[in-house]
């Protein structure tokens, strides 16, 4: 797991934490713990490549996470419209959940007016909070689904309404579960991709620190 915070701005990329305090300008100049370092070509090239990689990868990770959340919302929304109709309140719940999860993401990769800040210590807390938010939201989804099916059933009442509701709810749960599994697989693939990129960045960071000794 990353051990540093990263602060990206037009003037520099700052890496703070296990690495001490490194500031790298877009041309590869380095200030370490407040001291400007005099670098040879190879050191400057490593510093330049590392800050370029951070400038590229952090927005890629942030953008990818936002897109995956939106894709999951749209896919689940389709299931809800099909099963409960376009007026279902569950659709609002999904939109709210999407917004809440994006806010959680912003605790890890914070958007500033002049760039991004990556907070490495927020990762574990956000994982936990995110899980709680999803669980609470799913409880609300279930409650709304029951209510809405009850209303629907009362309108078409014939036979045993409770049995019909439970049957419909089983169908809805299955449809949501199937779609959720699809999206989860997608998220996992994205997660692996992120891990590979973070590992590559860590390798670059270590190489740079070794070169600066």
What are these regions (language model features)?
Residues 1-98:
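N-terminal Sec/ER secretory leader and immediately downstream segment
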Residues 85-88, 150, 206, 213:
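Glycine-centered secondary-structure boundary/capping sites
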Residues 38-42, 46, 118, 161, ...:
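General structural signal for secondary-structure boundaries
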Residues 1-17, 160, 192, 196, ...:
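Charged/polar interaction segments and conserved charged motifs
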Residues 163-213:
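A cross-kingdom marker for long, charged
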Residues 88-185:
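Extended amphipathic alpha-helical interaction segments
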Residues 67, 74, 81, 103, ...:
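Heptad-repeat coiled-coil alpha-helices
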């Amino acid at each position: 797991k990353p051990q540093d915070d990263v602060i990206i701005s037009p003037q520099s990329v700052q890496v703070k934490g296990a690495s001490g305090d490194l500031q790298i300008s877009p041309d590869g100049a380095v200030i370490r713990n407040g001291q400007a370092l005099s670098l040879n070509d190879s050191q400057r090239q490593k510093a330049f490549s590392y800050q370029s990689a951070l400038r590229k990868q952090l927005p890629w990770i942030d953008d990818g996470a936002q897109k995956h959340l939106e894709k999951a919302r749209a896919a689940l929304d389709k299931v809800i419209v099909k099963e409960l109709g376009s007026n279902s309140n569950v659709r609002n719940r999904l939109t709210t959940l999407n917004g809440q999860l994006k806010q959680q993401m912003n605790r890890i990769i914070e958007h500033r007016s002049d760039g991004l800040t990556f907070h490495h210590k927020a990762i574990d807390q956000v994982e936990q909070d995110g899980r709680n938010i999803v669980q609470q939201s799913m409880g609300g989804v279930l409650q709304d689904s029951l209510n809405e099916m009850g209303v629907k059933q009362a309108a078409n009442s014939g036979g045993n309404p409770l049995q019909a509701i439970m049957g419909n709810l089983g169908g809805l749960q299955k449809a949501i579960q199937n779609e959720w599994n699809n999206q989860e697989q997608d998220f996992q693939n994205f997660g692996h991709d992120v891990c590979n990129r973070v590992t590559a960045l860590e390798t670059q960071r270590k190489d740079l620190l070794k070169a600066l000794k």
